[in-house]
Amino acid sequence: MPISQWPPLRVPPGAMGWVLPQFEQVSPMQVLVFALLGLIIGSFVNVLIHRLPLMILRADMASDHSSDVSTTSSAEPCLGLSTPPSHCPLCEHRLHWYELIPVLSYLSSFARCRHCKGRIAWRYPFIEITTSLLFTLCLFQFGWTLQALMACFFTAALLALAWIDAETFLLPDVITQALLWVGLIGSAMSLTPIPLIQALSGAVLGYSILWAVSWIFATWRGKEGMGQGDLKLLAALGAWVGVWSLLPLLLMASVSGLIFGVIQKMRGQLGDNGHFAFGPFLALSGFACFFLGISMGV
């Protein structure tokens, strides 16, 4: 029987409706499409995670040494999201098309570069599989709709931001600003569950709250306690979850971040300055508020 004729997924009545309202309405073909789309987008998320911090670093170095820009650009190859083509980060061997197939290429090469035999980071298949699972979750939550695709964009952007921040303490503007504007435009077009006025209020208040916290901390302690990227991320999240979800979102992020910080401090892995990335906790809490509809009940 062709896959397009497979019957819809069936579960006991009401078993999943409380959290995944569209679970019983989607077909296996639709699940397959979203799962494959997740693998493909997950591969692109890996590109963002690897290249965006390097691009930001090079841009900062170029601005610090503006007189040497021509020398630097001639000495180093142009770096973008599509240039140079995908290659091994160890030996810079250009990858063939069959070495770019999500997950399968990693497994078939036994997690090693086919050219230099260097080990490939486990992050690559992990991100691809995670994105695929999250995209499938979006389908179960919103069904075969444009809203599901919007939710896929939301989850992929948060995954990229969380991982980049955890590794580099950076939250690239190109992603946070895209997240903000897509959220606002999607709300205006009724492609997200949040009315436009709540999305606008959430974005403004989200930025303002963390700006106030950051200003108070800097005035009190005489040093910066929160990066500008966190402010922009909460503004973007506010556009997606609305103003009434900001307080629960901040509470969840703060509590989970505090627990993580205490554990890292006890293990002696927090560092002398006591800093750790807050973006992943904002991203995870924003994801929970968006998909579970967590708000102040207004």
Question: Where do the model's predicted regions map?
Answer:
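Short, strongly hydrophobic alpha-helical membrane anchors
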Residues: 1-29, 298
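N-terminal signal-anchor transmembrane alpha helix
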Residues: 29-56
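Functional transmembrane core segments of multi-pass inner-membrane proteins
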Residues: 34, 147-256, 298
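C-terminal ends of transmembrane helices
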Residues: 46-51, 110-118, 158-170, 211-224, ...
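Membrane-proximal soluble regions of multi-pass membrane proteins
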Residues: 51-123
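Multi-pass membrane catalytic core of lipid/isoprenoid biosynthesis enzymes
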Residues: 92-147, 151, 230, 235-236, ...
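Interfacial loop-to-transmembrane junctions
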Residues: 227-232, 262-288
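Juxtamembrane boundary at the C-terminal end of a transmembrane helix
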Residues: 291-298
